[in-house]
Structures are given as structure tokens and as C-alpha cells.
Amino acid sequence: LYVNSGSSALYIGMEASNFPEGGEVITPALTFSTTIGCIVKSKLIPVFIDVGFNDYCIDVQAIEKNITSRTVAIVAPNLMGNICNWEKISEIAKKHNLKVIEDSADTIGGTLNGKLSGSYCDWTITSFYGSHIINCAGNGGMLCMNDEKMINDAKLLRSWGRSSSIFDAKSEAIENR
């Protein structure tokens, strides 16, 4: 789903996830402000953990000891071209029935053990801002998921609740322009 920025992709994805108010979201302390902003705006509680000294990615050894009965998700960015240990994060999330959200703004097209960035998570975002791998002369972002209901909810959020126009249902969708 194309949106105006990677930040908007995070906000829309978090809103479309319908997490229960007061749920906890594990995230690294070293991240862009949007990661925290979308958690707080969705009335969730960020649980900060440290990052690895050499890769600046979420410290997978610290995740499990920070999981509580209120934890609903893990949100982690790949940072400065370094990809998180998504295999371990995914394994922990499955064990505890948590959603995994990847911010791949810095690593679109990157691979981990032959699998593309974004393959281990429930949904991912990327940004096309000028400082990222692929840019589009200013801004732009994308939300990627494999959940039809959630993508339909996200489309409604992107279009301020409109699902059709005076012409037809497809006339307002940016993908059809």
C-alpha cells in the first residue's frame, strides 16, 4: 500500500493492526522517533531494549526477558544497512504469539540467509525519503503485508474512510492512476 511517507506507513499499519489499548510493544531504544510515535498514538506502551554494539539492531537476547502477558508485538528497524536477526525474532514471536513488525527503510532489497528483508514479519514498511536506499524526489512510503482484511482497513485509513467515489470504487486508489 503506497502512502506519503514511511512514517505514515508505520502509523497506518499500527492502527490497522487493532492491538488492544495498553498492550506492550517491544522496540529498541535506538530508533527514529516515528517508531515510538506510532506506538504511543495507538495507545500502546513501548518497552525499550538495547541494541547490539556492532550492528545497532535490536538485541535479540534481551527480547524474551522483556515479554509480559500484555506484550502484543515486536517492532524493530533494520538500521544503517544492518538486518536484524529476524529468524530469532520470528521464533520468539511465534513462541509467545506476538506480531512482528519490520521497519526496512534502510534495507529494502536486503537478504538474510537468502530470504528477502520482510519475509519473517507480519508486516513491514519502507520509506522512499531521500536518505534511504530508494527515494522518490522527496518522500513516499509503502506498507507491505499479506492480510487482506488488514490491507483493506489500511486503505480506508489512508483515504480518510472513503472506499468509493462518485465514479467507482477504483477511481480514488493511487494504485490505479
Language model regions located:
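Phosphate-binding glycine-rich loop
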Residues: 1-24, 38-41, 48-50, 115
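Hydrophobic residues in well-ordered beta-strands that form the structural core
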Residues: 21, 27, 48, 100-102, ...
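Proline-centered loop/turn at the N-terminus of a beta-strand
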Residues: 24, 45, 72-73, 97-99, ...
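Aromatic/hydrophobic pocket-lining residues that form π-stacking "cages" and hydrophobic walls in ligand
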Residues: 35, 89, 154
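Hydrophobic/aromatic ligand-binding patch that stacks against planar heteroaromatic rings
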Residues: 37-39, 92, 133
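Catalytic PLP-binding core of fold-type I/II PLP enzymes
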Residues: 60-75, 80-114, 147
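Active-site region of PLP-dependent enzymes
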Residues: 107-113, 120-177
